[in-house]
Amino acid sequence: MIKIFTALFFGSLNVISFSPYNFWPASIISIFGLLIITTNCKNLINSAKLGFLWGIGNFFNEIYWIYISINKFFGINLFFSIIIILLLSSYLSLYPTIFVILTKFFFPKINFFLFCVGAPSAWMISEILRSKILTGFPWLEIGYSQINGPLKGLAPIIGVSGISYILIIISGMCVLSFYKKSYYPIIFIIFIITLTYPLNFFKWYSVKEKSTKIALIQGNISQHTYIDNNQIQKNLEQYLKITKKIINSSNIIIWPESAIPCDEISCRNFLLKIDKELKLKKSYLITGIISLKKSNYYNSIITLGGNSPYLDNSKNKYYKYNLVPFGEKLPLKSILNPIFNKLGLSLIDLKKGDFFQNQLKIFDFNIVPSICYEIIFGDRIRKNVKINTDFLLTISNDSWFGDSIGPWQHFNMARMRALETGKNLLRASNNGITAIIGPNGELKSKLPQFVNDFLLEEVFSTMGVTPYVKFGNIPLLFFSIICFIISFFIKIKLIFLKN
């Protein structure tokens, strides 16, 4: 029983390493606890169970706030909302369980190799699986804890997954020091931090002379109001009012996801009208909207204004690729659809865009866009960044989750994308956090949550491609796979020798 509560406790501890708490050492302590309780357990099955319980403590505390949207907007009572969160947490807990099984089976001996190579390689593989299987859900990899920590300088080189790799090594060295009663592993940790900390002051980019005035509008429209068809005109007027106030002082105006609460066809007259006004002022508007293409609906980003006339089939458009499971896309549709129909739940089923898409072209600026939680898929973002990319853009609607910690977690993961790519990131969110993030991941300016306001800044383009944009996770993933292939053959050899 003590081991069960210990596993849950250490898993729960991890959440305070992320925003809004930002106590980054908590992730090291949390992983230290996971490694201690599983390496101290000689039975593989029992170790896997403890890994699963650590995952429950970790993921339930990290994503509990999803119940707000399930309860308030889908009409599911609180009890069943919590059950759904537990089921999702249980699914996500399979990945730390895989991590424990891999380390226990392939690296049974408690030594330097286990904690410096075996455990971090196993973690890398389990996290890659979490980001790929089904729709993928790489929410809060432990590397995100370092956005304000001493290892953040590694992000432009090895990305958030690489930082996670290093954190597993550091936690592992703490465990090794505990078991061996030796200070040498601690010296190794000091060596790692001493070696990597100066990277925090190194710039992988240079600032161009090219800049533009950008305005980000935060409408702060409640989700209840947004889904009310009688409020559509009022919501649009709210955004128009602020837009007219700043149109003379900004070149690019950005509205968030769901700013236009109707599809592109239904709002065509409104779009043509505002497009005309923008052209007179020689400004651009970038906004989220639902688009219809070949009988399929897409969550998309469109551009208005500029030199070309507005067309609903314009190529200067973006279609969301990573759709939110259950919110925008029903996974395992053939199995789950009949169940949801019996429960009387009608879910949206959008079509996803292509993995690779053109950058948005605004004046002579090239912008890599993303919508909502797509910003957590760092590998896809970096694959769409080109040598001529000027900015990253993400638009979101976090009003589904109220004043919980969810929007803050989301915001800090966006900061990591700016740091990994060396690009300014523009973030417009319906109710916050609307902000401009610098190419070093630092906050340039932001609006408070839950206000109806705008952010107006001159933003400079940056030049340069970081090592992470070039190579991604490939070097570390390749190394991890090679480690397991070698370990597998060693394991087979030992079995034969034993027999």
Swiss-Prot record:
One of its GO terms (biological process) is lipoprotein biosynthetic process. Residues 217-461 form the CN hydrolase domain. GO terms for molecular function: N-acyltransferase activity. Its EC number is 2.3.1.269. It is an enzyme of class 2 (transferase). Pathway: Protein modification; lipoprotein biosynthesis (N-acyl transfer). Keywords: Acyltransferase, Cell membrane, Membrane, Transferase, Transmembrane, Transmembrane helix. Its main location: membrane. Catalyzes the phospholipid dependent N-acylation of the N-terminal cysteine of apolipoprotein, the last step in lipoprotein maturation. Belongs to the CN hydrolase family. Apolipoprotein N-acyltransferase subfamily. This is Apolipoprotein N-acyltransferase. The gene is lnt.
